[in-house]
């Protein structure tokens, strides 16, 4: 079969491209996805409060593991990635955070990326979004991604934690995606008005999947991209458990949207990557590109947990005998505890004036539990997820075999610089100062984790090594740019190759300040216009906050 475009990966970026490209009825698109459908009757992926469940299984999660991380007690750490229509937007925490304006302005300083500054990206964030309280200079009201804002009457602990951050001397902000990211405030979520997860499968593919010019193949594992010389011409993939490969051809382009872990793997297997990797697995080089799989970045975070003196936390919702009622309210009304991811407040701060924009992120949660649903504390409690935003540490991804079913070797090299340790120590100490504020006096009990005895630098470092976990934000492994380690240009085109683009979180040159999903969707929206060859949306004129010489904290 021949299509105009073949998209590899029906995730946060691939579904955007499939939807936008098939708006033209004369353009044919094949969308290949290694996972299955996003079953709408499966509460694990559709109920926001059930976000921990997909991470515990394998149906929707590739469940990669890292190599032993040398600075983290040689732990093999989780690296969950979404599998199925929606990709990681099918299993993520649904936090709608776009990053800081300065992240994009920094990207735009790199040669060839001049049009990736914030004011050129903002129109594409708006294009993708329908915010439940309407549009303004920063937000959209007619896009495929449903965004829900926290409502009055939500858990009192959210308000107390934001108030405590302000009492500790940090700014207050009413919109973490608006004029000013820096500060504490309410956190939006990608949830529909009916309380369902707003994955890109729901938001984008639902409007496109009935189009005759879009073909969606699930359980289709891409083996390699096929080339004629240096021109990408087709894809070889396996359908289900069938060991006979399928071959499809592209008239125009192949768009690789398999994510920060799988995109570099597919390139390497196809003969595009570092010479030593291609040689090791006896792969004929199509084009030697040393940056494929390099520059890997992520966010690391810790949980600081406290007992709650009043019975206001979500602890009762963890009890099996309360869950049928919560489930029924969500199923029939789309409301209640089940309709929220429970990350309804958070913030971004600078740990010192040496950072020009926030370097620490907080998510507040009114229960004490691990992100993947394990190790729930058997008392009323609450916690802050806290971690650094722009670690200088860099890792890598490389294939371990030519077999597409084999997981790659992943090394993030977490905490490999002195800056990492300084930021994490500061983050723990600042969090404790916030938790000690009067706003939390009615609620704050004993510190559960790390525990009040953990005070010295050495003790804090040991806690980080033993307990810090991924925030599930891998990116950067096929970075945009023009330098010798860049893999794609500012339009996602692979250097040295014709008719092949990479469009997903792997192309971010530097990780952003916050969760990655909204930005990955924005990147795909912006790239869709580049692929179509149409004029970009006009740059925004909106103001945005630059800290300048403002203190990081008022005394």
Swiss-Prot record:
Entry keyword set: FAD, Flavoprotein, NAD, Oxidoreductase
Biological or metabolic pathway of the protein: Amine and polyamine biosynthesis; betaine biosynthesis via choline pathway; betaine aldehyde from choline (cytochrome c reductase route): step 1/1
GO MF annotation list: betaine-aldehyde dehydrogenase (NAD+) activity; choline dehydrogenase activity; flavin adenine dinucleotide binding
Active site: 473
Reaction equations catalysed: choline + A = betaine aldehyde + AH2; betaine aldehyde + NAD(+) + H2O = glycine betaine + NADH + 2 H(+)
Biological processes, Gene Ontology terms: glycine betaine biosynthetic process from choline
This protein's record includes keyword Flavoprotein: yes
Coiled coil: none
GO CC, alphabetical: membrane
Gene3D superfamilies: FAD/NAD(P)-binding domain, Glucose Oxidase, domain 3
Signal peptide coordinates: none
EC number: 1.1.99.1, 1.2.1.8
Annotated residues for binding of FAD: 4-33
Cofactor: FAD
UniProt record similarity statement: Belongs to the GMC oxidoreductase family.
Role, per record: Involved in the biosynthesis of the osmoprotectant glycine betaine. Catalyzes the oxidation of choline to betaine aldehyde and betaine aldehyde to glycine betaine at the same rate.
PANTHER family per the UniProt record, alphabetical: CHOLINE DEHYDROGENASE, MITOCHONDRIAL, GLUCOSE-METHANOL-CHOLINE GMC OXIDOREDUCTASE
Protein name, as recorded: Oxygen-dependent choline dehydrogenase
Native source species: Proteus mirabilis (strain HI4320)
């Amino acid at each position: 079969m021949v299509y105009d475009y073949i998209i590899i990966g029906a995730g946060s970026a691939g579904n955007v491209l499939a939807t936008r490209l098939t708006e033209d009825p004369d353009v044919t698109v094949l969308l290949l996805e290694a996972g299955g459908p996003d079953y709408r009757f499966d509460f694990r992926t559709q109920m926001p409060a059930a976000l921990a469940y997909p991470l515990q299984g394998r149906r929707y999660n590739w469940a990669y593991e890292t190599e032993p991380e040398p600075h983290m007690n040689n732990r093999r750490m989780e690296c969950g990635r979404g599998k199925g229509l929606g990709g990681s937007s099918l299993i993520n925490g649904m936090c709608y955070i776009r990053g800081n304006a300065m992240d994009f302005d920094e990207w735009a300083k790199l040669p060839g990326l001049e049009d990736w500054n914030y004011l050129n990206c903002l129109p594409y964030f708006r294009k993708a979004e329908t915010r439940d309280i309407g549009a303004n200079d920063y937000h959209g009201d007619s896009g495929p991604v449903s965004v829900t804002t926290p409502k009055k009457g939500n858990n009192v602990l959210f308000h107390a934690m934001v108030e405590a951050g302000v009492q500790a001397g940090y700014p207050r902000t009413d919109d973490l995606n608006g004029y000013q990211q820096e500060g504490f405030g309410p956190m939006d979520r990608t949830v529909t008005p009916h309380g369902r997860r707003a994955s890109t499968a729901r938001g984008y593919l639902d409007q496109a999947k009935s189009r005759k010019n879009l073909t969606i193949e699930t359980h289709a594992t891409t083996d390699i991209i096929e080339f004629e010389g240096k021109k990408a011409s087709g894809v070889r993939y396996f359908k289900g458990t069938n060991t006979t490969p399928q071959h499809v051809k592209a008239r125009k382009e192949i768009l690789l949207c398999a994510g920060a872990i799988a995109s570099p793997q597919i390139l390497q297997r196809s003969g595009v990557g570092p010479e030593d990797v291609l040689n090791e697995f006896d792969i004929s080089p199509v084009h030697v590109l040393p940056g494929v799989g390099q520059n890997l970045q992520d966010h690391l975070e810790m949980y600081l947990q406290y007992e709650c003196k009043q019975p206001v936390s979500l602890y009762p919702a963890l009890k099996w005998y309360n869950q049928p009622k919560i489930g029924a309210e969500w199923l029939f009304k789309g409301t209640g505890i089940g309709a929220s991811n429970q990350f309804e407040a958070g913030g971004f701060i600078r740990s010192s004036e040496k950072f020009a924009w926030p370097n620490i992120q907080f998510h507040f949660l009114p229960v004490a539990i691990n992100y993947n649903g394990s190790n729930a504390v058997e008392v009323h409690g609450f916690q802050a997820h806290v971690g650094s935003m722009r670690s200088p540490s860099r890792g890598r991804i490389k294939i371990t075999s030519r077999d597409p079913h084999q997981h790659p070797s992943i090394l993030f090299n977490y905490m490999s610089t002195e800056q990492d340790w300084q930021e994490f120590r500061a983050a723990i100490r600042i969090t404790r100062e916030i938790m000690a504020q009067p706003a939390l006096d009615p609620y704050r009990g004993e510190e559960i984790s790390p525990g009040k005895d953990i005070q010295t630098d050495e003790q804090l470092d040991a806690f980080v090594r033993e307990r810090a976990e991924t925030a599930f934000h891998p990116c950067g492994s096929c970075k945009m740019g023009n330098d010798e380690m860049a893999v794609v240009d500012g339009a996602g085109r692979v250097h040295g190759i014709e008719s092949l683009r990479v469009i997903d979180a792997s192309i971010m040159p530097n990780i952003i300040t916050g969760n990655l999903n909204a930005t990955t969707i924005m990147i795909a929206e912006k790239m869709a216009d580049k692929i179509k060859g149409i004029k970009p949306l006009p740059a925004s004129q909106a103001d945005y906050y630059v800290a300048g010489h403002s203190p990081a904290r008022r005394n």
